[in-house]
Swiss-Prot record:
Subunit annotation: The glycine cleavage system is composed of four proteins: P, T, L and H. In this organism, the P 'protein' is a heterodimer of two subunits.
Catalytic activity field: N(6)-[(R)-lipoyl]-L-lysyl-[glycine-cleavage complex H protein] + glycine + H(+) = N(6)-[(R)-S(8)-aminomethyldihydrolipoyl]-L-lysyl-[glycine-cleavage complex H protein] + CO2
Name by which UniProt lists this protein: Probable glycine dehydrogenase (decarboxylating) subunit 1
Upper classification of the organism: Bacteria, Pseudomonadati, Pseudomonadota, Gammaproteobacteria, Legionellales
Species of provenance: Legionella pneumophila (strain Corby)
GO molecular function: glycine dehydrogenase (decarboxylating) activity
Family according to the record: Belongs to the GcvP family. N-terminal subunit subfamily.
Function according to Swiss-Prot or TrEMBL: The glycine cleavage system catalyzes the degradation of glycine. The P protein binds the alpha-amino group of glycine through its pyridoxal phosphate cofactor; CO(2) is released and the remaining methylamine moiety is then transferred to the lipoamide cofactor of the H protein.
InterPro entries: GcvPA, GDC-P_N, GDC_P, PyrdxlP-dep_Trfase, PyrdxlP-dep_Trfase_major, PyrdxlP-dep_Trfase_small
Presence of keyword Metal-binding: no
One annotated GO biological process: glycine decarboxylation via glycine cleavage system
Gene: gcvPA
Keyword Oxidoreductase among UniProt keywords: yes
Gene3D superfamilies: Aspartate Aminotransferase, domain 1, Type I PLP-dependent aspartate aminotransferase-like (Major domain)
A Pfam family the protein falls into: GDC-P
Enzyme Commission number(s) of this protein: 1.4.4.2
Length: 456
């Protein structure tokens, strides 16, 4: 039904009908101390022209800085064609394509997306997306627990180098499902998971192992050894990966002796703008043998009664709209529009283009680290190789440095000390393909000035 606001006369008549003098009388039972004072100063309504002027005034307060922040959300170049196509009326819809005969275009695009994700991850089947990277990993953990019929403990090992927000999301979702989450410590010299701590669980009943590649610090984990450990210990292995890195690094399906069991991650780098944190989408892929425990939509290819190729939702008996409480997941939709953009993005770039993006990210970050570590009081925090972000250690308070950089128009990075107290005064920095040599030089010059002034 349309939204029709009440007229002043409507409001007056309704208040008279219930014996109230004004709107505030409706809230008298709520103590004043619990009422939000800000609602008392809401300005009167304005017309469209005044609203546009106010929006322009507010927009002028924004500052367009040079961004060197990564930590799970990355600034990549998005070809103009991506959202020009994704915004077409044929794609720009919230409709879930249950009616296959009327949705062949959308279904084929989702099918192509699944194929691309499988090619990137080295797996056999993908779903049509999850809400974001964090919930995709949480769903992957739940899926791993369902898959491991031999385990009686529901104990899940998660590398401490997995994104802290992802680990918090997992804790939130599994805490009431009789699943014990154990965080593995990391080597504070290398910046990767301490394999000695992992080996302590050899022979024990461990349900699943979660590995990040690259990890939160940007470092490259010893994924072959960790995956092989999981296989020999009859533990389901879960890989949480950055899709951009897969254009250069070994796909999770080839890790160790047999590859991982489940792959998931954040799809934002594939054509979605940073957009203040969302919306994004998560991806999840696995082995065909595990498909019936996979959450979310799956699109399949089939033939119609005339023998023509067609596409439809398949294996729907796993899902909430059919199985209700017995479904593999409470997720009953997908991030279709973001997946549409990701499919167009990957199609436009192709394998060679994705490889060029990943290579440029890798080179830019190494050039950035080389420039920054030449400054007195700045050093690389970890020894392990890194992909397109890295942690630097400062001899000055990190919040002071970040504020000074911000004043100079530079978003200088992410301070992880709130999650890792042992990493005080460190800064996680990232340089994707959009950062130029001039951007890197400006960052280095500005940081050098800040460090020298504070030191003096």
């Amino acid at each position: 039904m349309p939204y029709i606001p009440h007229t002043p006369n409507d409001t007056k008549e309704m208040l008279e009908a219930i014996g109230a003098q004004d709107i505030q009388d409706l809230f008298d039972e709520i103590p004043a101390s619990l009422q939000y004072a800000g609602f008392q100063n809401i300005p009167a309504g304005i017309n469209e022209m005044e609203m546009l002027k106010e929006a322009q005034n507010q927009a002028q307060k924004n500052r367009n800085g040079i961004c060197f922040i990564g930590a799970g959300c990355y600034e990549h170049h998005i070809p103009a064609a991506v959202w020009d196509i994704a915004s077409r009326g044929e794609f720009l819809t919230a409709y879930t394509p249950y009616q296959a005969e009327a949705s062949q275009g959308t279904l084929q695009l989702l099918y192509e997306y699944q194929t691309m994700i499988c090619e990137l991850t080295g797996m056999e089947v993908s779903n049509a997306s999850m809400y974001d990277g964090a919930t995709a990993l949480a769903e992957a953990v739940l899926m791993a627990v369902r898959l491991n019929k031999h385990s009686k403990t529901n104990r899940v090992l998660i590398a401490g180098t997995v994104h802290p927000f992802y680990r918090e999301t997992i804790e939130t979702i599994v805490r009431n499902q009789h699943i014990e989450v154990i965080t593995l410590p990391f080597d504070e010299q290398q910046g990767i998971t301490d394999l000695g701590s992992l080996n302590q669980y050899t022979g024990e009943d461990i349900t699943a192992l979660v590995i990040a590649q690259p990890n939160f610090f940007g470092c490259l984990e010893q994924v072959d050894k960790m995956t092989s450990w999981a296989h020999h210990n009859k533990t389901i292995s879960v890989a949480c990966v950055n899709p951009t890195s897969l254009a250069l690094l070994k796909p999770p399906g080839s890790w160790g002796e047999h590859g991982v069991d489940i792959v998931c991650g954040e799809g934002q780098p594939l054509g979605s703008p940073m957009a203040s944190g969302g919306p994004y989408f998560g991806f999840l892929s696995t082995r065909m043998a595990h498909v019936r425990q996979m959450p979310g939509r799956i699109i399949g290819r089939t033939v119609d009664k005339d023998g023509k190729t067609g596409f439809s939702l398949t294996l729907q008996a796993r899902e909430q709209h059919i199985r209700r409480a017995k479904a593999t997941s409470n997720i009953c939709t997908n991030q279709g529009l973001l997946v549409t953009a990701a499919t167009i993005y990957m199609s436009l770039l192709g394998p060679e283009g994705l490889s060029q993006v990943a290579t440029q990210c890798h080179q830019n970050t190494h050039e950035l680290i080389t420039a920054l570590t030449q400054i007195e009081g700045v050093e690389l925090a970890f020894k392990a190789p890194f992909f397109h972000e890295a942690l630097i250690k400062l001899n000055q308070p990190v919040q002071y440095v970040l504020q000074q950089l911000a004043d100079a128009g530079i978003a200088g990075g992410y301070a992880p000390e709130q999650h890792y107290p042992q990493l005080a005064n460190t800064l996680l920095v990232c340089a994707t393909e959009v950062r130029t040599a001039e951007d890197i030089a400006k960052y280095a010059k500005t940081l050098k000035t800040i460090m020298s002034k504070r030191g003096a």
